[in-house]
Amino acid sequence: MGQLDNTIVVFTTDNGAENITFPDGGTTPFKGGKLTTWEGGMRAPLLVRWPGQIKPGTVKTEIFAALDWVPTLVNIAGGPKGDALKKQIESGQYPGIVKTTLDGVDQTEYLAGRSEKSAREVFFYYTGSQPSAVRYKNWKFYYTMVPDTATGGLYGATTYHWTQIVNIKRDPFEQTVGADAKSLLAYAGSIGSPSTAYLYDWNILPIGQLLWTKELMSYKEFPPMQAPETYNLDGILKAMQQSGHRSQ
């Protein structure tokens, strides 16, 4: 058996298409792009070669986050399995440098085809350090979003007056959510759809609230390690003013 037969090859990217630099940055059929929490900014291609485990040509459509690679590859390499790695990290045993938590989940069974379901049911979307949206299974809850234009990620996020929610499998291109006129018209059309579907969407709103409450409460024991940098003009000018001095 050669070395390649004992090696997992992963080809992916860290974000959706950077359509602000089209055509070099790529394009996507999904809404938004890099620097946004729309699906166009979060969905990324993923190719995996794992001889003897993943059959060539296999297509998987369940949730898989880049965060999941750490516990998954550690498991495959012979390290702690399942939640064991997370427990070690939270107790400060591993890597022994800092006490924190692990947001990834072990996806070994899903990748190997021993489970048809992903081990991940929830994914949190952040705009910088600001909670933006959350996905639970096929449902995505929207709270604070940037414009879905190519340059939307360069501007501040807008907090919606009410939570928007959509079945992302039913509307993968997010046509019925957003603040632009086209989205609002589509949203109105969805209200006119079978009332059972519309009412069901709104009846599960507490799920998103409970998920975010649990996520934010975890900051008490495991606070963010550092604040993200700001790239908006106001923040840059303020930093320049604070670092300089007035002429005498």
Task: Identify the meaning behind each predicted range.
Residues 1-6, 78-88, 116-118, 214-235:
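Surface-exposed helix-capping loop/turn segments at secondary-structure junctions
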Residues 8-13, 46-47, 69, 73-74:
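Beta-strand elements within well-structured catalytic alpha/beta cores of enzymes
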Residues 17-39, 55-58, 62, 67-175:
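C-terminal cap/loop subdomain of S1 sulfatases and analogous C-terminal strand-loop tails that border
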Residues 1-22:
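Metal-dependent active-site segment of extracytoplasmic phospho-/sulfohydrolases and closely related
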